[in-house]
Amino acid sequence: MATRSNARVMWRMLGLAKPLAGWMVLAVACGVAGFCCATGVPVLAAEAALSAVEAGSLPWTLGTTVAVLAVMAVARGVLHYVEQRCNHYIAFKLLAHVRDLVFGALRRLTPAKLAGSDSGALISTVTADVELLEVFYAHTISPICIAVLMTVVMGAFLGGIHPVLAAVALASYALVGIAVPVAVSRASGGEGRRSRDLAAWLSGFVLDGLRGLGEVLQYGAGASRLEELDRRSAELVASQRKLRARGAAGQATTTGAIMVLSCAQMLLAVWLAGAGLVTAEGAVLATVATFSSFGPFVALANLGSTLQGTLAAGNRVLDILDEEPLVAEVPDSEGRHPGFDGIAAEDVSFSYAGGSSADGVSASGEKILDHASVGVEPGQIVGIQGKSGSGKSTLCRLLMRFWDVDRGRVALSGTDVREVATSALRDAEAFVEQDTHLFHDSIRDNLLIARPDATGEELEVACRAASVHDFICSLPNGYDTMVGELGDTLSGGERQRLGLARAFLHDAPLLLLDEPTSNLDSLNEAQILKSLSDQRGHRAVVLISHRPSTMAIADKTYSMDQGRVS
């Protein structure tokens, strides 16, 4: 996690609000006008009371004064509503924009940078951390601007009575609106960030436990995991309690400071009136105005505690947005579009360079491929076999350009894949891994991910080729059947056949299949192998398998051992 100052985090988040600057100006204008009404009501009432005893200078009648007070009171409510409506419109628009940016960043980082990462922490960032930014966009930006402008307004009003009164008021505003929140923030230290990190860890721990609930129950590990969950939960509660305690102390300090400073202003006004430096009317109005003007600055004072968690969340979001992908996408305008005339790995060497493989296994820089060369011609079926860990799956991922090679090159139609537009590369290839991911959606929508504009007939043809159409039709809702989270209502073989159907529907000229029949019985295997054999001449197929029966349909077979190809 990068270390950024709070000011830097705020500046970066503020930059995202530029497209909504007009709404922000409206919110600030309504906020300033609303606080002017809030302060003006007691000031005008005091002036009316003074005029009633012939100590004021109000030129209006009592009826007019009451009408003006009523208008100002109603206006205060309306203006506050509009201000908050604008602030939350800005906040929710920006939260949607930030989510879009985060998902875009995750897509760029996948899979090389996210392999083996804590999915629970990512979920926490995408959901809870992004939601916490609402505090900044709805309750921080405009209150700061409103407080600054109200300082100018009140300084001008009190300065018109006496400069010393204005100076004391400005010092009071600075103490309440700046000194108190800064002190609370410093007292909190890194507790806000620690609290967010603990929450993210707990999210990952719970997600892990739910996914592995069967193993936890089978091996009686529930007590130890529950103990760890309780321990970390207690740490999170303690951290949040500290933040709330700091916030409560800040609020108490703010309230006490306002009372002391307002009384000091009152005593000063009395002294100035006694010395003949201001009129009695001026002393009363200055006192009333000061007592009623701290609203905008109380909002700032409260940020000292509430903003800690928000800035920590913002820092975690920026970590994702600023992360550089290991494999940079090639835009359509800059990349080449060579079509498909074969693909080849030419003298390729590769290691995960101390990171993690796509399976989340630390590679510690171990060379996975060592001067490996493989060629696939259009319409050809190529088999790759070898022991587990020999680099077969890694080779497929390099052909997909999920990672870039260390030496040599991967060439699509004679063009280095690093020069091919990413969209063109994805259109040319379809990859089915051993574990097919299915979304918590219908079978139809899971398949249409590969080609959203596919017709029902094309969908059926792909499913028949994957030997899964009859199974789908046997379900109560057919293609509209929900598959459950991660496809957990289906067997491994059913998920695998749906993955194959999705690849067939994509209709790419190159199919990369990693153990496509590992979860299938002999009957379904034979049907799928026949479908794959029928692809010969229509599209190229790369098969990774341990099964001799699968390799039997290959036109050419490579053997891999310790990263070398023979």
Regions found by a protein language model. Name each.
Residues R85-G104, S142-I146, A169-G214, A221-A223, ...:
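Cytoplasmic coupling helices
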Residues P19, W23-C36, H139-R194, L267-V278:
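Transmembrane helices of ABC transporter permease
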Residues H337-S566:
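ABC-type nucleotide-binding domain
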Residues M24-L79, G159-V164, L277-A280:
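Transmembrane helix-loop-helix hairpins at lipid-water interfaces of multipass membrane proteins
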Residues L14-P19, P111-A112, A128-Y137, I141, ...:
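An intracellular "coupling" helix at the cytosolic face of ABC transporter transmembrane type-1 domains
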Residues S51-T61, F157-A171, R246-N315, I320-L321:
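Helix-loop-helix
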Residues M1-A38, L58-T65, E83, N87, ...:
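Membrane-integrated ABC transporters
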Residues A2-R4, F92, D100-S124, A128-V130, ...:
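Short intracellular "coupling" helices and adjacent cytoplasmic loop segments at the cytosolic face
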